[in-house]
Amino acid sequence: MMGREHDKQAQFTPDHLGTKPVAYKRNKGKKMHNKSNEQPDVIQTKGE
């Protein structure tokens, strides 16, 4: 769970990524969610 939250925060703060594009990270997260076959917790966290 904590790992997912970290991913979300990293997306919000592209400062940490710097050389890495945010789109790349987003794509990775999307793939992960698809593999897990579970609802994206990121969206729920964002709403809250």
From Swiss-Prot:
One of its GO terms (biological process) is sporulation resulting in formation of a cellular spore. Residues 1-48 are annotated as: Disordered. Residues 23-34 have a biased composition (Basic residues). Keywords: Sporulation. It is found in: Spore core. One of its GO terms (cellular component) is endospore-forming forespore. It holds the Pfam family SspN. Its main location: other. InterPro entries: SASP_SspN. Transmembrane segments: none annotated. It comes from the Bacteria. Induction: Expressed only in the forespore compartment of sporulating cells. The keyword Nucleotide-binding does not apply. Belongs to the SspN family. NCBIfam families: PRK09398.1 (NF006904). This is Small, acid-soluble spore protein N. It comes from Bacillus pumilus (strain SAFR-032). The gene is sspN.
